[in-house]
Amino acid sequence: MATRTGSAVWEGTLKQGKGTMRLGSGAFEGPYSFSSRFESGKGTNPEELIGAAEAGCFSMALAFNLEKAGHPAKRVSTTATVKLEPADGGFKITSIDLKTEGDVPGIDESKFKDQAELTKKTCPVSVALAGTQINLEAKLL
């Protein structure tokens, strides 16, 4: 299976510094800063990228589960709202709210919701965010 990468460079202090985040595929490269993360400044932030990853994975996984259940979707749209809050002298992602909609011929609301609940438990990004070991390699330059 595929291994994917993302990278980031940060220059300067927390509040005055700036950085760039990149996807290994080259599909995205964007600036981020204290302002884009904790205020409403221009640029992206880690939580926004986590939200996009969760929404993208969830939509694909739900379409797959619906198809396996005999109800191929015409369209699945998901928004993930990632909440970052102060905690223990730092910050913590406290919740991710998923809102998903599907155009799925021949399925009722109850079965659609059942498939969405199954997907919440099996989507690879959802599983990773529920608790994944983080391995660290640190090198001082």
What is the predicted function of each stretch?
Residues 1-52, 59-141:
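Extended beta-strand/beta-hairpin segments
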